[in-house]
């Protein structure tokens, strides 16, 4: 049984090793072992310890239960992005660094496909705007009543330079994926309008800061419209933007490459449930593809719908004064 499980783990390591990478080199880096020790494990001469197997699953994004054949067919394992809620900024920065590493890896594969259906503005657009990022995090802090109690207003929240840099870096690598599909509905900018109005009325943000955020929302709209007209990001990678005719109840995404499959289900604003489970991947992918049938493609086509949509969103943002 041990030999069979170890052989299955070795097979999974080879299957999830990125193209043009050496599995032995990856083991040396991930497990902090020497070259000969890495090759002995890959040849099956030395079995992997449970700790080593667990670390490899986390780094290489595959399910240990499924590798060793222990996964129950009626149960799925998810990883919650945020498990600790007492140090949000530090935790969020660590998650960003892991996400950047993952997106950098999958972006190197020309077959990579990244798809999202969401009722909120995705980070691949707002993530490069410092104040929009800051408000998103401030709102999260306030809703969960965590973080520094001295940060009572938006203006008092200062994001570390490393976090701001990682937010922009994440956007860069997400947009480096070969093909992106994004489905959203009419409510995404309305959500920002409602939140900013509410926080302003509670004296949690000043009118001056609201105007700064308004200007960044306008700038993001200009960027999104340019992307929609061209059907590609500034770097030339393709993006298919769909406008849903029905309201989207939550946010779902999947990424697929020649070696990886993973999904994320959004929850609690910045949080999410993640899993590489192949069955859940098929469910989420099918759900997103189904949503596209109730949507209009506005990137590179659908000109009238696209013009009307962006005109309406600018009218919504203008209500911020």
Protein language model features and the residues they cover:
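Hydrophobic protein-protein interaction segments
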Residues: 136-312
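Charged, low-complexity, helix/coiled-coil-prone segments
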Residues: 1-5, 34-39, 112-115, 126-138, ...
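Helix-turn-helix/homeodomain-like alpha-helical modules used for DNA recognition
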Residues: 73-149
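Generic detection of long, well-ordered alpha-helical segments
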Residues: 3, 17, 93, 207-214
């Amino acid at each position: 049984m041990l030999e069979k499980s170890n052989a299955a783990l070795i097979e999974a390591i080879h299957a999830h090793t990125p193209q043009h990478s050496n599995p032995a080199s990856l083991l040396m880096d991930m497990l902090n072992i020497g070259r000969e020790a890495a090759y002995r494990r890959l040849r099956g001469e030395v079995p992997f310890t449970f700790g080593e197997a667990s670390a490899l699953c986390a780094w290489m994004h595959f399910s240990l239960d499924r590798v060793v054949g222990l996964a129950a067919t009626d149960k799925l394992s998810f990883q919650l992005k945020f498990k600790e809620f007492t140090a949000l900024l530090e935790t969020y920065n660590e998650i960003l660094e892991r996400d950047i590493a993952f997106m950098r890896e999958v972006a190197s594969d020309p077959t990579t496909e990244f798809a999202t259906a969401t009722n909120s503005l995705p980070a691949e657009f707002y993530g490069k705007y410092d104040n929009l990022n800051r408000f998103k995090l401030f709102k999260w802090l306030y809703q969960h009543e965590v973080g520094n109690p001295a940060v009572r207003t938006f203006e008092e929240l200062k994001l570390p330079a490393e976090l701001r840099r990682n937010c922009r870096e994440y956007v860069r690598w997400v947009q480096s994926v070969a093909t992106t599909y994004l489905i959203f509905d009419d409510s995404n900018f309305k959500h920002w309008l409602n939140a900013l109005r509410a926080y302003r009325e509670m004296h949690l943000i000043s009118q001056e800061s609201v105007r700064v955020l308004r200007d960044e929302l306008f700038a993001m709209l200009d960027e999104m419209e340019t992307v929609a007209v061209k059907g590609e990001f500034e770097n030339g990678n393709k993006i298919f933007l769909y406008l849903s005719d029905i309201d989207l109840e939550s946010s779902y995404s999947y990424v697929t490459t020649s070696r990886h499959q993973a999904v994320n289900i959004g929850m609690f604003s910045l949080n999410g449930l993640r899993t590489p489970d192949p069955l859940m991947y098929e469910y989420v992918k099918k759900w997103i593809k189904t949503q596209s049938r109730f949507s209009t493609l506005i990137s590179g086509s659908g000109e009238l719908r696209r013009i009307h949509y962006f005109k309406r969103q600018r009218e919504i943002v203008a209500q911020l004064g």
